[in-house]
Amino acid sequence: LQTRIGQVRRDLGLDSGCGNYEQLWITTSLRGLVGGVLSVEILEEGVHSGSASGIVPSSFRIARKLLNRLDDVDSGRVLAEVFHASIPPERVEQAKQAGSILGDTIWKQFPWVSCSHAPAGHEQACLSAQPTSTDPVEAILNRTWRPALSVTGAAALPSLDMAGNVLRPKTVLKLSMRIPPTVDAELASRELKQMLERDAPYQARVNFEADWAASGWHAPAMPAGLSALLNDLSLQTFAKPAAYMGEGGTIPFMNMLGRYFPEAQFLITGVLGPQSNAHGPNEFLDIAYAKALTRLVAGVVAQAQV
């Protein structure tokens, strides 16, 4: 395909996100992703918990101990520096600008549960569960330029109606770690496997089978002419200037395009904004914004020589 396309001058990607539905949002980076399945086995078969607990360690507790190697249980900060990267100053500045636009909507957009209890004297202040940071700039940087670990699935756990007084022989967890845009995913995946499998507690059988290793993407510097054009089109379309922000998701194709076409100008944008809930059960698009953004992108194509 590269030989058929030839030299690419401009690359438009339209499956990214937006901070709100009031202006053009230009994606400056995408996080990478490494992940896989962690299996912890301590017995050949399940046994009576009354007979075995206290002698046989819980496979779930061993899994917890292994996960503690990866991130801090209180803050969620990923511990190993191999998963971190320095944040370019211009991206910090853009995060500050985006934070000033979005304010606390950067974290209030998510469907938090209401508080079940609150410290004495703070009942009115505690209306919902809270994020890792309420500072908009830190929240943006946390989800765009810092690694984060999630457990996205589990196996070898019976359903509640089938669970009995049995000490289970194993625990299996599906792990997903988002990594900064400039971290090498293959290197991070190898390190993740080594961190989980070495020195297994109680000499348990521990195996991590990697299934994802996709590096992120960091946008090249945008030419002044293209930046001015995008700002003008945003003002014409939305009556507000263009804004810049990284995204926390992963589009492996972008990293590949960046490698194959290093001289190309990139405009990555999209309609996945507040409450759009990408990949969720009620994913939706703001139709009015999608139509407006389509007109704006048509303007970019019409002025392809800028």
What function would you assign to each model-found segment?
Residues 79-94, 131-134, 157, 211-213, ...:
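A glycine-rich phosphate-binding loop feature that marks nucleotide/adenosyl-phosphate handling sites
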Residues 39-41, 46-48, 63, 145, ...:
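Zn-dependent metallopeptidase/amidohydrolase metal-coordination segment
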Residues 90-98, 217-226, 255-260:
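Short glycine/threonine-rich loop-to-helix capping motif typified by GTGT followed
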